[in-house]
């Protein structure tokens, strides 16, 4: 039978350390919070090797009394509370007395501190929980603590650490959040002796935001605030230009403590989406000040989670504050141009001048025209002989930057397409329900075209040369067409291409189709290491937030192989010199920012191939859009390119690119048959 044992202090501290000290950023959090509780106004953080080799914190707080230096490293020793009642009215960031003994048990610690009432300070050296020395030292008022060789005596914990770059990024993100919560404190962060962050400590939150996230972010913020009897809510929310695909740029503080609360995050997002339908997550910095008695922070060892006595009330206050600010912002930015007002007034006067009889006559004729069926004497030839290209000739054409077949080889390729077109692909059954399933369309068309395609390819005698995209003709011609050549009829709503083949009408989403072409082309080029690049006439210098720069630096090789030529420009700035050829019309700054955000969402566990696919998906932004007018030739080229990609039936996001209606289905819809 197992007997109950009393654990020794070392074992108990290491168990406690497992809860409190998860990684280097946990150490930084606990020590910086101690500095803030001591009233420090200047805090310097230095790290080496992602915090594993060294974490050094220097502050100008009140310091630790000489007689309490040793006592501070005893378990549950704290100056923050005295009894149980204090737990329910906590005004400090720390209170458990677990951090220092937990850290000292798994690292080598050099602790120095001095209070203003004494001429000398005290220095305590501890290694693995064992005191090595306690001596006097000379220093200014405040505290300095060095934590070296983290987890040196618990090597199993090291296996769970991420890369040095990632651990550094986590520390940087943590210090950024703490800086936002304390704009009246000056923070300096050094990583491997390089200054990463320096806030002014002037008490202005907007200055801290500008330092961390950049000038453009600070210029696109909306301030909000709401005050109630038991809670005050205030902060900034970004407009739609700052919305991102992840929640990385969301910060929530309760009584200056950085916490995570799903309910309050949803409150902000719901208020934001009342005025924006981007589907992305808003940037926000939210502060909630309330009485300590109305919250409970003692539910998690890291104090990162919090409970409210009345969470529904807080939810409503947050929602109302953000919603009101967004409503005023939209109202202020919406203005009717004076020119449009003048046109409206002129038109109104013109209508008033018309006689009542003429208005009645006009309305009656309009009613007759709406309810009147198509005249019997209108010939079908007039409908089917209509040439849509005439309407498009006078409009601006949209260039499609991807064409798998070069202009020199298009003529030759038409011989194959014509041979496919001349074959009779008959419907297997006339009576079928209308189908929107791209898989069914794919399988049906693939069966129809495969046999004829192989016969046509056997008869073709193309020479193996390179086209303008670097693909050999062999690579292009001997790729199977996934559906037969369609005849373009026109464009509907400047969004869908109408085409026909063998008594079947096809609707192609021009944006979805083009983005899939670009996606497969770009993915293939990355895999084969032959991405064609486009030099920028004027290189762009982009200053990134520190966290974004660290992600870029970690994935620098990914960007290079994806066709970007980027060089460091100092102080978290990068210089964009070249981009992939078909992305040159996009905003490189927004493109790089979006790619970094996508990589941040993926984390470090994904493979290089997955990251390449994620970057390739950004090619969607270069695709033709809905409401882009295309000429007949452009639509034909788009469909021709679509035929030869690996999966022409889905866009990169999984949506269908093609749907079809058979003649039978249309006849049934018009009740020509029963």
Swiss-Prot record:
**Does the keyword section mention Chloroplast?**
no
Q: Which InterPro entries match?
A: DNA_mismatch_repair_CS, DNA_mismatch_repair_MutL, DNA_mismatch_S5_2-like, HATPase_C_sf, MutL/Mlh/PMS, MutL/Mlh/Pms-like, MutL_C, MutL_C_dimsub
GO cellular component assignments: mismatch repair complex
Coiled-coil stretches, from where to where?
none
- Which keywords, in A-to-Z order, does the entry hold? DNA damage, DNA repair
Recorded superkingdom: Bacteria
For this entry, list what GO says about its biological process: mismatch repair
Q: Which GO terms describe its molecular function?
A: ATP binding; ATP hydrolysis activity; ATP-dependent DNA damage sensor activity; mismatched DNA binding
Pfam families of this UniProt entry?
DNA_mis_repair, HATPase_c_3, MutL_C
Q: Does the keyword Transport apply?
A: no
Say what the protein does.
This protein is involved in the repair of mismatches in DNA. It is required for dam-dependent methyl-directed DNA mismatch repair. May act as a 'molecular matchmaker', a protein that promotes the formation of a stable complex between two or more DNA-binding proteins in an ATP-dependent manner without itself being part of a final effector complex.
Which family is this protein grouped under? Answer: Belongs to the DNA mismatch repair MutL/HexB family.
Output this protein's name. Answer: DNA mismatch repair protein MutL
- This protein's species is Clostridium perfringens (strain ATCC 13124 / DSM 756 / JCM 1290 / NCIMB 6125 / NCTC 8237 / Type A)
Q: What is the lineage of its organism?
A: Bacteria, Bacillati, Bacillota, Clostridia, Eubacteriales
């Amino acid at each position: 039978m197992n007997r109950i044992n009393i654990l020794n202090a070392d074992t108990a501290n290491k168990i406690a350390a497992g809860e409190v000290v998860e990684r280097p950023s946990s150490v930084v959090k606990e020590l910086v919070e101690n500095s803030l509780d001591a009233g420090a106004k200047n805090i310097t953080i230095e790290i080496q090797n992602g915090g594993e080799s060294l974490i050094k914190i220097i502050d100008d707080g009140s310091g630790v009394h000489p007689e309490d230096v040793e006592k501070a490293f005893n378990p549950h020793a704290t100056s923050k509370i005295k009894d149980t009642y204090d737990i329910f009215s906590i005004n400090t960031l720390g209170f458990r007395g677990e951090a220092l003994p937990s850290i000292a048990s798994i690292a080598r610690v050099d602790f120095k501190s001095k209070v203003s009432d004494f001429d000398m300070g005290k220095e305590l050296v501890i290694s693995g929980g064992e005191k090595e020395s306690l001596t006097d030292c000379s220093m200014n008022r405040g505290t300095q603590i060095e934590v070296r060789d983290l987890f040196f005596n618990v090597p199993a914990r090291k296996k769970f650490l991420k890369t040095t770059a990632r651990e550094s990024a986590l520390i940087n993100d943590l210090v950024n959040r703490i800086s936002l919560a304390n704009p009246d404190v000056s923070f300096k962060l050094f990583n491997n002796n390089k200054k990463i962050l320096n806030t002014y400590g002037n008490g202005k939150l907007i200055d801290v935001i500008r330092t961390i996230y950049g000038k453009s972010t600070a210029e696109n913020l909306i301030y909000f605030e709401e005050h109630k009897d038991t809670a005050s809510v205030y902060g900034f929310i970004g407009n739609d230009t700052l919305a991102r695909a992840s929640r990385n740029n969301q910060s929530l503080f309760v009584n200056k403590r950085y916490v995570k609360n799903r309910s309050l995050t949803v409150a902000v997002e719901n208020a934001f989406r009342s005025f924006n339908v981007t589907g992305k997550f808003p940037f926000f910095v939210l502060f909630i000040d309330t009485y300590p008695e109305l919250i409970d922070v003692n539910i998690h060892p890291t104090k990162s989670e919090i409970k409210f006595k009345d969470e529904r009330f807080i939810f409503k206050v947050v929602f109302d504050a953000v919603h009101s600010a967004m409503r005023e912002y939209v109202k202020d930015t919406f203005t009717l141009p004076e020119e449009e007002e003048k046109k409206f007034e002129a038109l109104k006067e013109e209508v008033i001048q018309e006689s009542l009889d003429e208005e009645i006559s006009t309305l009656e004729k309009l009613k007759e025209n709406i309810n009147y069926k198509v005249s019997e004497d209108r010939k079908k030839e007039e409908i089917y002989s209509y040439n849509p290209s005439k309407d498009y000739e006078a409009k601006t054409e949209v260039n499609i930057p991807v064409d798998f077949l070069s202009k020199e080889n298009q003529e030759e390729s038409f011989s194959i397409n014509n041979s496919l077109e001349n074959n009779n692909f008959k419907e297997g059954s006339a009576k079928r329900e209308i189908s929107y399933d791209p898989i069914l369309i794919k399988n049906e068309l693939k069966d129809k075209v495969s046999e004829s395609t192989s016969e046509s390819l056997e008869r073709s005698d193309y020479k193996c040369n390179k086209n303008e995209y670097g693909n050999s003709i062999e690579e292009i011609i001997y790729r199977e067409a996934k559906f037969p050549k369609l005849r373009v009829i026109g464009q509907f709503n400047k969004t869908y291409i109408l085409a026909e083949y063998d008594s079947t009408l096809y609707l192609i989403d021009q944006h979805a189709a083009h983005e899939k072409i670009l996606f497969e082309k770009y993915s293939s080029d990355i895999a084969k290491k032959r991405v064609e690049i486009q030099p920028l006439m004027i290189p762009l210098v982009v200053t990134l937030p520190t966290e974004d720069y660290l992600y870029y630096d970690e994935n620098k090789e990914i960007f290079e192989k994806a066709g970007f030529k980027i060089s460091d420009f100092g102080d978290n700035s990068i210089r964009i010199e070249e981009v992939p050829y078909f992305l040159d019309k996009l905003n490189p700054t927004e493109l790089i920012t979006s790619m970094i955000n996508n990589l941040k969402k993926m984390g470090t566990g994904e493979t290089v191939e997955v990251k390449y696919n994620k970057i390739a998906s950004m090619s969607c932004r270069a695709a033709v859009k809905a409401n882009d007018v295309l000429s007949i030739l452009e639509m034909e080229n788009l469909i021709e390119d679509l035929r030869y990609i690996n999966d022409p039936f889905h866009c990169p996001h999984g949506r269908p690119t093609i749907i079809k209606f058979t003649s039978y289905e249309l006849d049934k819809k018009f009740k020509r048959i029963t």
